[in-house]
Every structure is written in structure tokens, then in C-alpha cells.
């Protein structure tokens, strides 16, 4: 193997230390860069205005024209310029399917002939009437010391009833499974709120509006919590998720049928049904719930905080005032639970971790609502609802 070539010496143009051979001449980087810029000058610009200049004491030229002349005299050659290299940055937009078709990604697969102008209306008036009756009926349960414990007891009772039933594994999620899950989830939320003493003091219109607005966010967190509990007790595997009352799915092995609600395929609707990092965030939230293993009191506060915060932001006005007051009352009850019952003087770290889970779900739901609005603009779905405010995040 030949010995390495060491290029040393002085620059043939200015006499400074050389950095190698540039354009056929041993020169420094400064003179090489200068020649690369100045070689394209026209003849008039190359003429020295003073006649002939000399280099200064430190080897620098006072005249650019004479410096260029010296570069040419020592043999620098413009034919050695390399002009066929790749650009460091390209001004052209990289070609993609979206740029090729000239359509945004979120309507990339939107085929106008599949859009549904005429829609089938799903009437949920019966569900709303059932909810109204449930919220008006008096509770017969013995009330605990405060409403947060009351909600925790209600949640435990609902889950106790389901624990006696065999878990059903769903392999295909279609129209029947979806509508059943929605109905069960909505009525479950109504039952829970009907045992909330401060909530029952609100007027009938306000109670119904809040429940209709927040039931989906409540259900999402409830199923996440229930999944974590069953995984802790070794009743479900890591890839299995609760999706309804006593029903679960294997997230790695299931089929979704959307033919009943849209003319588009699941592949075409990935943008609308999948949020960025949605699956990853949901799995991480389940793991966080497993690690924290919150009590029924803590889970009830999380459910209340997430659902009422969502309802207040969507409804505004007197609903916002009511939800803020309800959350504040339960925050005080949670403080008493930590300090008086658990004897925790400093619980801020644990509460922060619990609230991080609700914020993750809240962000996911917000994205779902925005995508649902886009889908409505382009008539992606072929179904509508008698009470559309209930299904803005589905």
C-alpha cells in the first residue's frame, strides 16, 4: 500500500499556508474560494485601475484584479471547476402523491362519486328520553360522606356487576357492535351521573346537555381504566382492550366493517380514524394506569375532570360555569381524601401523573372532533344522527 500523500508548502498566490491543490495549483482555501468567485468577471472588471499592484507585507492583496491575475499566472484553470455535484439544498418540492395530484393529504382518497349527499339518519331520541328519565329518578342508595366517594361507589358497583359476566371477545367490529357499544356507553355515563348529588341539583336541560356532550370522553377513559385493571389481574393480555360492557378486542387481530356508515374503504379513511401516535399514546396511558394503579376515588375524579372539562369547553355559557363549580367541589373532596384518609401531605406528583393521562385523552379527542368536521364537509360518512352533538368525537 503506497504511503499517504502529504500536501504542504505555501500558497502559490499569496504565500500563505496551503490546504491542498485547487484548480490545478497548490493554494490556500481563501485564494481558491476567491478564484471560484472572480473567474466569472467580465474583461472590463478584470483591469487593475492602478496599473500594477503588489502584495502587502502579510501576503494579502490590496487589489482584487491583481489577485485574480496572479491566480491565472500561476496556472489556476476554470476548466477544473466541478459543476456536476448535487445541490446542498433543492428548491424543487419533493414529489409525493399529494403534490402529484394537487390535493391535500386529508382528501387524497376522497372520490367525489363516493361522497354521500343523501344520508341515513340514526334516531337516538329513545336513548335521550331514557337518559332524561334516569336523571329525574331519585337515588335509593345510602350516600357516603361526600359526592366523590358516592361516584366511586357507583363505579365499583357497575364494574362488580360486569365482573360476574364472562368477557366476550369480538373479532369483527361492525354496525351491530358499534351501535351497541355507543348505547351501553351512553347509558353507563347517565347512570353514573345520576348518582352525583351536586349534578342532580342542576336544571333538567343543563344536565342533559352536559351528559350528551361528555359521554364519549367519559367512556374512553372508563374503558382505558377497566383495561388496566383487568391486565393487572391477569384477565387480559397486553394487546387486548375493553370496548364495551363485558366485551373486548385483540388489537392485533380484529376486523373493522365500515360499509354501513361510509362508501369509502378503511384504507382510504385512515386519516379520519387514526390520530398521530394515537395507538402509541393509548397504550402508554394504559401502562401508566397500571403503574399508578389508581383507586376508585382517583379514577372517579379523573372521569369527572375529563368529561366536565370537555363539556364546559363545548357548551360555554351557564354550562361552563356549572362544570367549573362541580370540578372545584370534587377537587376539594380529592384533597380531603389524600390528606385525611391516605395521610399524604404531598400528593402533587401523583396527581400530576394522573392528570397527564387525562390530557393525553383530551388531545386525542380534540383531534377527532376536528377530523370529524372535515369529514362532514366532504360528505365522507353516509349516516347522520338526530342528535349530532352526541357524536362529534366518534
Swiss-Prot record:
Pfam families: Hormone_recep, zf-C4. A zinc finger (NR C4-type) spans 11-31, 48-71. The keyword Zinc-finger applies. One of its GO terms (cellular component) is nucleus. SMART domains: HOLI, ZnF_C4. It is found in: Nucleus. SUPFAM superfamilies: Glucocorticoid receptor-like (DNA-binding domain) (SSF57716), Nuclear receptor ligand-binding domain (SSF48508). Residues 8-83 bind DNA. The keyword Transferase does not apply. This is Nuclear hormone receptor family member nhr-18. It comes from Caenorhabditis elegans. The gene is nhr-18.
